[in-house]
C-alpha cells in the first residue's frame, strides 16, 4: 500500500512531467516569431505535443501491465529529460517540432504513475489518492504557464526547457531511490496482444467508453480557453508580459482544490453528482470568459471555475473506470487518456483558428458549444444506463480491504 509521502511525491513528479508539455502555451507568440510560424498555425505546437502524448498513451502506458512500474517510471523520466534538452537547443522549426512531439510522448509517465497509484493505494482511499495525484497533474498544467512566463521574461524561452530538463533528471534520481522494487504483473499477454486488448476494452466496457468521450470533450473545452489566451492578453489594450499572462495559471491553480475534494466525494459514491455539477460549471463559466474585452477579472474567474469543473469531472471519470478491473489499470488508463489527448489536440488547433478568424468571441462560442455538448451527452447517456449508478453504490459499500459489501447491501442492486 502506498504511503502518504510517496503519494505526495507522485503528485509533484506528475506535475513536473505534465508541465513540460504546456510550457509553450504562454510562449506561442515568441516561439512563432522565433521559427516563423504564422499566428493561425502556431497552435500546431500544442497539437503535435498532444499527438505525441496520444502515441505514448497507446504504446507506452499499457506496458505498466507487464513491465515493472519502477523501471518504467524512472526510465521515462530520464528520457523526458533528454527530450527537454533537445527542445531547448533546437536550431530550427523542424527540430523543435520533432523534439516537442517526442516530449509529449514521454510525458505520459504521469499516467503510469496514476495507474501505479490506483493499483497500490488502499481501496477505501483510492479516490482520495487519485485526487491528490490528479491535483498535482492539473496544478502542473496551470502553474506551467506561470513558471514559463516568468523564466521566459527573465532568461529567454529556451531557459524554460533547460531548467525543466535538470529538474526531471533530479526527479528521476529521487524516484529511483524511493520506489520499491515490485514484481511484474501476472498477465501473460505479449505486447501486441496488450495493445489489441486496450482497444477491445473500449468496445466491451460502456463506462470506459462514455467516460472517455466526456474526457475528450472537457479537455477540448479547456484547451480552447487556454491555448489562444496569450494572444489577446499580449495585444491591445492589455499588452501583458509573459509573466503577467502566466499569473492566470495561478488563478486556475485554485481550481486544483476540486481534484482533492472530488476524490473524497467519489469515494462516498457521488461520482455521478460530481460529474453533473462540474459540467454545469464549465458551461456557465464561458459567459464570464466572454467579458475579456471589458475586464480581466471575468476571465480570471472563468479560468478558476472551468478548471475546478474539469478537475472534478476528470477525477470522477477515473474513479469510475478504475473500479472495473485492477489487472487492467494500465490499459484502462491508456484507452481513457488517449481520448483526452485527442480532445486537447483538436482544441488547440481549432482555438487558434477561431481566434484568427472570429476573435475572442469566436473562441468563447466554440468553448461554450463544446461544454454544453458535453453536458447534453452526459445527461443523455446517464438516463439510458444504470452502470455508473451501480458503480457509485459499489463504492459506498467498500470496506478497507476493498471488498464490495453486496451481501449486506443487496437491496441496493435490485
Each language-model region and where it sits:
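Conserved MFS/SLC helix-loop-helix module at the cytosolic interface between two early adjacent transmembrane helices
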Residues: 55-93
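C-terminal transmembrane helical hairpin of 12-TM major facilitator-type secondary transporters
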Residues: 272-317
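Juxtamembrane intracellular "pre-TM" segments in multi-pass secondary transporters
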Residues: 180-212
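Helix-loop-helix hairpin linking two adjacent transmembrane segments in secondary transporters
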Residues: 131-177
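Intracellular juxtamembrane helix-capping segments at the cytosolic ends
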Residues: 109-121, 312-325
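Helix-to-loop junctions at the C-terminal end of transmembrane segments
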Residues: 57-68, 258-271, 355
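Structural signature of the two symmetry-related core transmembrane helices
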Residues: 71-85, 165, 273-287, 368
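Cytoplasmic helix-loop-helix junction between adjacent transmembrane helices
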Residues: 100-137
